Amino acid sequence: MKASQFFISTLKEAPADAEIVSHKLMMRAGMIKKLGAGIYNYMPVGLRVIRKVENIVREEMNRAGAVELSMPVIQPAELWQETGRWDKMGPELLRLKDRHERDFAVQPTSEEVVTDIARSEIRSYKQLPVNFYQIQTKFRDERRPRFGIMRGREFTMKDAYSFDRDAEGLKKSYENMYDAYVRIFQRFGLEFRAVAADNGAIGGSGSHEFHVIADTGEDAIVYCPTSDYAANMEAAEALPLVAERAAPTQALEKTFTPEKVKCEQVAEFLGIPLERNVKSIVLAKDTEAGAEIWLLLIRADHELNEVKASKVPGLADFRFATENEIVDAFGSPPGYLGPIDMKKPVKVVADRTVANMSDFCCGANYRDYHFTGVNWGRDLPEPIVADLRNVVAGDASPDGKGTLEICRGIEVGHVFMLGTRYSESMNATFLDENGKTQPMQMGCYGIGVTRILGAAIEQNFDERGIIWPAAIAPFEVVVCPVGYDRSEAVKAEADRIHAELLAAGVDVIIDDRGERPGVMFADWELIGVPHRVVVGDRGLKEGKVEYQGRRDAQATQVAVADVVGHVRGQIGK
């Protein structure tokens, strides 16, 4: 490849609306151009990276026995209505009507369509297992698209769907895909971690997320450094405390706390540790009889885990109560709420840590007052107890093999055990060995192809630009001739190196644009090509050229006769 026949368009400064490193660098490197909110053109440099990501994904999916197909981006609403996701997905599902007023969805995933294929094509257990996959454009109508391609509205995704005859078969398919994902991310050359996760809106019984580790990641990854335990924050269990609850030592007292509405303010005013305070979170569950009010109690230095809260029996699809609902149920505005002297019946759920507390402080359901010396059993009934909080560093690992630590990650893949969630609702069945009708057991497996680009950059960059892992770099090597248009010797040697690397199967580009050295070097460091060879008259007089890896602090002088072998050795070809 010659740079003069390629398209390179770099910027010295990132656009003002670029917020995170990957967005800034992709815009500056000319990888993407913004077309609209959350919608981007993928320019030639960016598309080359996407194609390399796709090729690795495709090779490993084929190796794992999956079969590629392609499903429509526009899908009939009737299929989504069969599973209930037409209504459940909410506004992030882009809906449209054709000229005949028929409803359609612009796919964010394709569970319904692939299940429709399976129910029409698979009749017998002899046709199972099967795993279909596609690499296809998806659309999610994000309320606030941001961070470039990391949270865009249109994106490319690999989604796969397995169909098995029983739960044991599903487990094998799931493990097969899990192993394939490990190989994929290892081949990408990225530091990653697979973590236990919640299934969310997809539904099903079990799942893992694959996260690229990056300090700028928006997701918290919980792991135990002395074991294999890893989970995302939503799924990480906060274990019950081992110690028994201490006996009361204080009397219940209603204490004046003027205008102290936050737990931190109350703790400071009363001179007690923050962890002796309990914060009250009021939820509402809408029923046919009206809104049912729930009070969740969390230690003041902890945070509510909404996914865990939604799994409390009776709290699925909860919402946060309005201020009017709060005043009506507690007789007090927010800031002074607690589980004692409530105005109306309220279901109280305490986090495991709160249920283990004694002599604690909480709101008195009266403006400017809090209770101190509160104790379960003596001052109020024992609560419903559940794991409601996010774990924190230092908590005991759920596998009992150490304590937890937390790092940041960017989710780029997800595997789910769906079970019969879709096959039963869409009547996707087969006949087993005994001639009996059975629902197919399903799994689904996604990789955010375009999101990989942003995640890789967030993990691999410096002050000069992107540092691509070799496997997904737009080019493996760039040959930079200084004076290509002025020196026959430089041109001849640069062309020779370029040709020999091409013949060896190296993905190489020669910069024949005639740019000044500073501009040329800055462009390729920004774009992030991992290996660079510089050819110049001064070096050639000594029989040398310069080699420098993108992460190297200094260039290495290499004999002209050895440079191709040296570069091939660096990239393993």
Curated annotation (Swiss-Prot):
According to its UniProt record, the EC number is 6.1.1.15
Q: Name one GO biological process term.
A: prolyl-tRNA aminoacylation
Q: Where in the cell is it found?
A: Cytoplasm
Q: Which InterPro entries match?
A: aa-tRNA-synt_IIb (IPR002314), aa-tRNA-synth_II (IPR006195), aa-tRNA-synth_II/BPL/LPL (IPR045864), Anticodon-bd (IPR004154), Anticodon-bd_dom_sf (IPR036621), Pro-tRNA-ligase_IIa (IPR002316), Pro-tRNA-synth_IIa_bac-type (IPR004500), Pro-tRNA-Synthase_IIa_type1 (IPR023717)
Which CDD domains has this protein been placed in? ProRS-INS, ProRS_anticodon_short, ProRS_core_prok
Pfam families from the entry?
HGTP_anticodon, tRNA-synt_2b, tRNA_edit
Q: What Gene3D superfamilies is this protein classified in? A: Anticodon-binding domain (3.40.50.800), Bira Bifunctional Protein, Domain 2 (3.30.930.10), YbaK/aminoacyl-tRNA synthetase-associated domain (3.90.960.10)
Q: Tell me the superkingdom of the source.
A: Bacteria
GO-annotated molecular function: aminoacyl-tRNA deacylase activity; ATP binding; proline-tRNA ligase activity
Function noted in UniProt: Catalyzes the attachment of proline to tRNA(Pro) in a two-step reaction: proline is first activated by ATP to form Pro-AMP and then transferred to the acceptor end of tRNA(Pro). As ProRS can inadvertently accommodate and process non-cognate amino acids such as alanine and cysteine, to avoid such errors it has two additional distinct editing activities against alanine. One activity is designated as 'pretransfer' editing and involves the tRNA(Pro)-independent hydrolysis of activated Ala-AMP.
Name of the protein this chain belongs to: Proline--tRNA ligase
User: Taxonomic lineage per UniProt?
Assistant: Bacteria, Pseudomonadati, Pseudomonadota, Betaproteobacteria, Burkholderiales
